[in-house]
């Protein structure tokens, strides 16, 4: 090594490192563990018990606890509510997306139902005999797996559905949607699930049980109020609840309820076991109905989902939604 190369500095000894004694390994006291187990079993112990009887009692108690916990969790599970589809039928010569059959829901109805923290599912039409996409899924599967059904508004109910012919071509309605929603409605009723119909849905409930409709209120009831105008949901009128109606109980104290009005058809002859829940004022057009042989199957002729945006003078229909969801929750019992 060259003499002019720098040398490393000498190491300076540090303070001595004190060695810590190793922590003793703790061995679990088997007697203590056995004691805890015995004390746990003691609450199930009875005089003269055999080991088999004691084991059966312990297993039975724990099974009941698990079942109660499952029931609590199931009842607290978020409700799953189905909404029927509106259907767009393409016109001849349409191109692109408008050349396809479309199924959709109006945003406000979904948001109104979800305002009570439930999950909303649009229910499509089904075709078990389809050539392209055959399926074994039926509308009954939806009725079994969902907790309730909302029937949307939309196109007219076809007069053929209540054994009439349309008096004008533009009142022909949507027969395909009628068939789909009637099956859907009956499937939910058959399994005891609640149904809430809005506008067209109200009319469909009446028709489903043998009722009929006015094809056009202005034509068929000349003295009636105008129930539809170009201002759409801004058009409104008063309603009244007949004595003993469930809506009258829900809205006890509301002196002059106001609702929107967006319909030119209306309930005419009531179906079997259908009772009137509300009339329009002063013309007496049916505005709400209820099917008496089910816990909750109700139709509202107005659109409750538009009321919040329409102003404070419109009837707050949250009690109706809450009653519908109560019935949905109770079907789990």
Language model segments and positions:
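Gly/Ala-rich beta-loop-alpha elbow adjacent to hydrolase catalytic centers
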Residues: 197, 201, 206, 210
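Active-site-proximal beta-strand elements of phosphoester/diester hydrolases
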Residues: 298-301
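N-terminal beta1-alpha1 cap of cysteine-dependent amidohydrolase-like domains
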Residues: 2-194, 207, 214, 218-251, ...
């Amino acid at each position: 090594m060259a003499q002019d190369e720098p040398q490393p500095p000498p190491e300076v000894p540090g303070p001595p490192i004190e060695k810590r004694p190793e922590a003793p390994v703790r061995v679990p006291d088997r007697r203590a563990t056995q004691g805890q187990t015995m004390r746990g079993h003691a609450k199930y112990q009875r005089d003269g018990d055999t080991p088999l009887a004691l084991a059966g009692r312990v297993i039975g108690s724990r099974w009941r606890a698990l079942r109660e916990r499952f029931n609590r969790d199931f009842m607290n599970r978020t409700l799953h509510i189905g909404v029927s589809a509106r259907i767009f039928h393409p016109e001849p010569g349409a191109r692109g997306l408008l050349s396809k059959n479309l199924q959709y829901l109006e945003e406000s109805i979904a948001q109104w139902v979800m305002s009570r923290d439930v999950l909303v599912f649009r229910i499509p039409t089904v075709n078990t005999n389809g050539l392209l996409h055959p399926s074994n899924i039926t509308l009954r599967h939806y009725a079994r797996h969902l907790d309730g059904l909302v029937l949307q508004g939309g196109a007219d109910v076809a007069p053929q559905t209540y054994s009439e012919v349309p008096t004008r071509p533009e009142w022909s309605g949507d027969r395909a949607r009628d068939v789909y929603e009637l099956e859907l409605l009956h499937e939910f009723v058959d399994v005891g699930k609640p149904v809430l119909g809005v506008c067209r849905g109200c009319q469909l409930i009446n028709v489903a049980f043998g009722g009929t409709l006015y094809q056009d209120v202005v034509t068929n009831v000349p003295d009636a109020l105008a129930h539809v105008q170009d201002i759409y949901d801004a058009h409104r009128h008063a309603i009244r609840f007949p004595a003993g109606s469930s809506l009258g109980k829900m809205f006890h104290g509301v002196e002059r309820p106001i609702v929107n009005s967006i319909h030119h058809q209306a309930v005419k002859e009531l179906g079997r076991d259908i009772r009137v829940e509300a009339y329009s004022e002063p013309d007496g057009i049916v505005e709400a109905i209820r099917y008496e042989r089910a816990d909750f199957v109700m139709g509202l002729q107005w659109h409750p989902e538009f009321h919040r945006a329409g102003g404070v003078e419109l009837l707050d229909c949250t009690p109706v939604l809450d009653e519908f969801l109560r019935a949905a929750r109770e079907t789990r019992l």
